[in-house]
């Protein structure tokens, strides 16, 4: 698994997972480096079919180390290779993650990473327009294309701000919900949960 444990997820879960890791207590020490989040999910992974069906997903990532190349699905992945510390860390890590997700009123999806990738793609398109070999081929159309790119960048900037504002609202709902649960205010928590059903449905439709 390399030098650290990793949670691989869809882009939209990254913010929530990073916040989750930041608030973790000390877990079993199995790696020299701290646990990290990586994205996106990979097409060969079992959870890919879930994500494209509209279910936000995450998995225990193990493609960053040699295990995938030397042991996975082979006769070498046996009792001798078993590591007690790694076993305990991953059970602690994902058990606490399940509890954290269980204490959310709204699915904690943050769409700004997707918009950031769109913005990066537009920057790359603009850079290509200035390449000498492309400039000659585009001719007068280059300026039109650059104007369209600028227009799309402006729209993506607005979308990025909106995504961040929306996530702050989601995070606020979830903070309040968690506090209600911890304080035993179950009726209020249930009321907040019901209040946010429409919002959650919109988020899941947007994800799909």
Give the residues covered by each predicted segment.
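His/Asp/Glu-rich mid-to-C-terminal helical/loop segments that flank catalytic regions of hydrolases
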Residues: 67-119
């Amino acid at each position: 698994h390399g030098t650290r444990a990793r949670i691989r997820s869809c882009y939209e879960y990254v913010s929530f997972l990073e916040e989750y890791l930041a608030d973790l207590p000390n877990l079993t020490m199995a790696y020299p480096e701290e646990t990290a989040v990586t994205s996106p999910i990979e097409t060969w992974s079992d959870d890919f079919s879930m994500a494209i069906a509209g279910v936000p997903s995450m998995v225990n990532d193990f493609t960053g180390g040699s295990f995938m190349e030397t042991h996975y699905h082979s006769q070498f992945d046996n009792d001798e290779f078993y590591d007690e510390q790694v076993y305990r860390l991953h059970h602690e890590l994902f058990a606490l993650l399940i509890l954290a997700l269980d204490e959310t009123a709204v699915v904690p999806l943050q769409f700004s990473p997707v918009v950031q990738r769109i913005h990066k793609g537009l920057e790359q398109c603009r850079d290509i327009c200035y390449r000498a070999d492309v400039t000659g081929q585009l001719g007068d159309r280059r300026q039109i294309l650059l104007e369209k790119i600028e227009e799309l960048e402006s729209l993506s900037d607005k979308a990025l701000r909106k995504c961040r504002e929306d996530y702050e609202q989601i995070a606020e709902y979830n903070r309040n919900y968690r506090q209600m649960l911890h304080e035993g205010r179950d009726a209020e928590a249930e009321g907040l949960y019901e209040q946010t059903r429409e919002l959650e449905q919109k988020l899941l439709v947007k994800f799909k």
